[in-house]
């Protein structure tokens, strides 16, 4: 029931704010509160003096509890307006962050939508405003595709919409830990949008826009490569620098702290807690903190199909660079679902810079660079030809395919069915390939198995099992659990509010039960599913490589139930944490060592079109952000390492897999290090052991 507070002032503010604006949706007479779609929420009318508001109470079982407000006639045309706004009041007992997302068809939280947010203390009112950021549509832009970001337009199509085709609004609380209550007054739009003037000669002047090195033509910046001679000069300068600065003098051969405490040496990497802080311990018994970078390998390739006018002096037209054509499968974006022809500008640049033996030379250089830069780990998705040189400790990457859980969904694909015998079989077949390579290798810290898989909320995988076909192994396992608990289908029906005629009827059904009524059973099976996942992998890893660590699955989107399951079986639990700081990160499970598998920062001052997931203003701010992030992890008692994503920038025109074209490398597409970032790496890496030991 809504609180008894008076809304008069609240609604008066809304009315004043509406001056010169248009009400898009109000909650007065005729609004059907009972037909508002909800996710872990309930709604009702808050009828007070001065008008009505929408009262919303949210739970904390879903990742994004809230409501959906659909356009009454299928879509709203908001093209005349600059923003959407709503007035909200926190009527709950807890501080709340409210989000309002404006959607086009196909909105996924990143593309085809724009989002605004507002944080309110208990009793506080405020206005949540969402800028109706348009998808860029200049004459040249209409000819561009297949990238996350576009020239001169930070973020490109991400966080942008077609304002003429808005289909719905989502009002939600992101990943709450407690229940919330809030009220929303009339939703309105305002501001007169003025489209940019057309530039009739723009297209002719714009193309081609990528030079022979894969760089943006229409801009210059510090460090841009203008000739092969510049590449050679930078190579010579870097060789001198690496000779003068070979690496921290107090490290042992592994990158552990030779000058620090000596613990038990086992000949392999392990974990130990010392004076309240978790550490890795290197094979010689020295403290080791994993400071590394992902993707130490050849650069990603970029699609070239349909882009013939984009390139100036395209290297692929020369016989000596024709070897860098390839084909790749696209998972997301313009080329999604297709195998497309692509080209490796980075490889062509490496051949120009290092000669015909470029692969061997860049592999050798990677080890020398990392040591000099204060890094001691070759991290995920790196080239075995590089890390099996056994000069820098590394982690190995394990991926495999088995039958999916058909009712599941996720950004990178469906979850696999851990109860299907094929899961364990394919896992062990893949790990067997590491025999004689990483398995038993003292330089191998351990294994990441999988990456950013879709854990959903605390019951999602149980619901996915029920939504799967009758021959799904997980579904049969779940129903067996229910039979053991309830015995008769009638007892299950009474508990869940269902009307299945028999257990076979439940097996045949693909309908999801009422979440609230079935919660305890759904949560119990989710726990069983998650623990089975981690147990099977732990057992397989330890059978093939008993001396290597199981480093988990690199959580990106995870609930507490899955995180606690990981703690039971992983030696180290891994997270990909894209944020400014991890100093205050709180793990929901028991005291376990943690490792960061991915993080990055990017800017638009070096010719790239997208900042990546955590934007910064420029390279100076990028360096400062790097230092602050890693030192925050060093102060945290549970973190035993941070791995930057990634070694090289992504292609200017987007990688094949998913169109990413982020400025997130330690080196650019011409293999030129970013000096500001490298200086930050050195500052942090060369002092990290004393810094961590002395922290609190």
Describe each region flagged by the PLM:
Residues 283, 293, 301, 307-358, ...:
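Polysaccharide-binding and catalytic clefts of secreted carbohydrate-active enzymes
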Residues 59-160, 165, 178-183:
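Extracellular ligand-binding interfaces
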Residues 464-477, 645-696:
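Aromatic-rich peripheral "rim/lid" segments of glycoside hydrolase catalytic domains that contact
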Residues 213-388, 405-440, 515, 520-528:
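Active-site-adjacent substrate/metal-binding segments within catalytic domains
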Residues 442-446, 450-452, 599, 614-666, ...:
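Substrate-binding cleft of secreted/luminal carbohydrate-active enzymes
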Residues 44-66:
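Short carbohydrate-recognition loop motifs
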Residues 524, 528-612, 627-634:
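Glycoside hydrolase catalytic-domain groove-lining segments
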Residues 342-350, 406-416, 508-523, 556, ...:
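Active-site clefts of carbohydrate-active enzymes
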